[in-house]
Amino acid sequence: MASRYEKEDSKRRILSACVQLFLEKGYQKTTTVEILKKAGVTPSTFYNIYHTKGSILTELTEFMFGNQFNISGKIVGEETNPVLLYAVETCLQLTLAELNENLREIYVEAYTVPENIELIHKKTAVQLQKIFVPYLPGYSASDFYE
């Protein structure tokens, strides 16, 4: 049985390989065989960790949406107006999607998978509540989600 360290290392290598392959070839054109080869893992290791290529996309989506507001905050400054922060975050997403056709495809894939849409909406709703609560007191994250 693989140790926790080995599993985490395999997971990191799979994610790294996927990011590189998805950006180079696109999500749809990247095969599981290519991921296995680039990551240097066996099929059983891959399927034990991720089960499908789609589950990797979900994890990458979660990472991206978990960090996008932090990155935007670093760009404009942590103490900036929250509405400006939201505008910068939105512009950052649009710019990234326009920079590279394969990156745009990743965004489209992420936004069309029901599991990912749910994740995106919930994470965005929490951030929108933080940003707009001064203007809409009494609103909760679910008010921005539902």
Predicted segments, located by residue:
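Short, Lys/Arg-enriched anionic-surface-contact patches
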Residues: 5-10
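Amphipathic alpha-helical packing segments from all-alpha helical-bundle domains
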Residues: 111-146
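Amphipathic, non-membrane alpha-helical segments in soluble helical-bundle scaffolds
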Residues: 54-58, 83, 87, 117-118, ...
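Hydrophobic alpha-helical connector segments
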Residues: 59, 73-103, 113, 121-125
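Long, acidic, intrinsically disordered low-complexity segments
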Residues: 31, 41-44, 98-111
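Short, basic, alpha-helical segments at the C-terminal edge of helix-turn-helix-like DNA-binding modules
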Residues: 61-69
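Helix-turn-helix
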Residues: 2, 13, 21-55, 59
